[in-house]
Regions:
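Gly/Pro/Ser/Thr-rich low-complexity, intrinsically disordered segments predominantly at protein N-termini
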Residues: 1-222
Length: 222
């Protein structure tokens, strides 16, 4: 699994540079996240702490569940996803690939859509996350898309699942709980995104571990 976390804030000085995808691939790896979109190269800067905290928390929580249930692979940026040939090169904050689609994972990138993508919004990524990527992920076959917006006075999480018509539909959150389709049996208390309780204990709750096991976990962490 990838261990480094995503960045989202775009720097555009005199407009993004233009180049072919092959030229983009040949760029030196200087530790910066770069996306290639419609022939433009987008350089990214380090995000805010809250962005990384949420990405890291989801990586631990989802990762525990996906590994325990043997459901597939989970990645965080920097990891390239090229949804379709000739399409944009994106580096989602978090992406999940199911066991059935592991053949899409190559040595350097994911060739094809992830089953689930999570983008955590920053001030500079609002248009990309809510508009550009929403349309792009919908058109290329992503099954589920979460948008987590931690900005002050805008704190919210939106969940979309692919409908029978192939379009994203807003998924229900009932009693503060969201249930995923792309990750079978996984559910999430939305408040956890902001509270970020211990990921192992929340995983134990999701997985339905007995009270005895949960108590043992708490004692080990005490």
């Amino acid at each position: 699994m990838a261990t480094e976390l995503a960045t989202q804030n775009i720097v555009a000085v005199n407009g993004p540079p233009r180049m072919t995808y092959e030229e983009y691939l040949a760029l030196p790896n200087e530790g910066r996240l770069i996306e290639w979109v419609n022939g433009e190269v987008i350089y990214n800067m380090p995000p805010l702490t809250i962005h990384q905290d949420i990405v890291g928390y989801l990586f631990r929580l989802l990762g525990n569940f996906v590994e325990f249930m043997n459901l597939g692979r989970l990645y965080v940026a920097p990891f390239e996803m090229k949804c379709r040939p000739g399409g944009s090169s994106r580096e989602p904050d978090v992406l999940f690939v199911s066991t059935a689609n592991l053949n899409r994972i190559g040595d350097k990138r994911l060739d094809g859509p992830a089953d689930l993508i999570v983008e955590v919004v920053s001030d500079d990524s609002v248009g990309r996350d809510f508009d550009e990527k929403f349309i792009e992920y919908q058109e290329c076959g992503v099954q589920e898309y979460w948008i987590v917006d931690p900005r002050p006075r805008r704190k919210r999480a939106l969940f979309y699942q692919r409908g029978a018509d192939g379009l994203f539909e807003a998924a229900k959150v009932e009693n503060g709980v969201y249930r995923s389709k792309a990750i079978p049996a996984f559910w999430l208390k939305v408040a956890w995104l902001w509270e970020m309780p211990d990921a192992q204990l929340t995983f134990a709750e999701i997985a339905g571990f007995s009270d005895e096991v949960v108590r043992a976990l708490k004692e080990r962490k005490a």
